[in-house]
A protein has these predicted regions:
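Phosphate/pyrophosphate-binding catalytic cores of soluble transferases and nucleic-acid-acting enzymes
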Residues: 1-147
Length: 147
């Protein structure tokens, strides 16, 4: 294995759905011994969908630290900007502990935001509220209409 600097290096594993990213990351983490796996999959941040999101099982995670998996209910708002703030913290904490951060997932927007940055567009509550109200109005009108 190539020399790895645990203070500065980050491994990123990306690929298509069901391509073996998680199992490869786990085997790499076990080989390195001082590593932490950090989620970069937009579906795996949610708690209510472990099968749908294919979150590694407890048995698969055994002996390897996993971060940013199953963070919050699928009904709660979560954005790439929120993930970016969290992943940067996790990477810094891992490096401070002398651990190799292994960022793994298939969400290109998450990975690109980590590698290239993202514009910090402020949330506009007025537009968000209007959009949510319009969605609720349209949704309820479709649900209530007879077939």
């Amino acid at each position: 294995m190539t020399n790895i600097n645990l203070a500065t290096d980050v491994v990123i594993i990306s690929g298509a759905t069901a391509s073996g990213k998680s199992s490869f990351a786990i085997s790499l983490a076990k080989k390195v011994k001082k590593a932490v796996i950090i989620n970069a999959d937009s579906a795996q941040v949610y708690t209510n969908a472990p099968i749908l999101a294919n979150i590694p099982t407890e048995a698969e995670r055994q002996g390897v630290s996993h971060k940013l998996f199953a963070l919050q209910p699928i009904t709660e708002y979560f954005s790439v900007m929120m993930w970016l703030q969290l992943v940067k913290q996790e990477i810094s904490q891992a490096q401070a502990k002398g651990m190799l951060p292994i960022v793994v997932g298939g969400s290109a927007m998450y990975l690109l935001s980590l590698l290239e940055g993202i514009s910090p567009i402020p949330s506009n509550i007025l537009y968000r509220t209007k959009a949510e109200n319009l969605y609720e109005k349209k949704r309820s009108s479709r649900v209530c209409q007879p077939c």
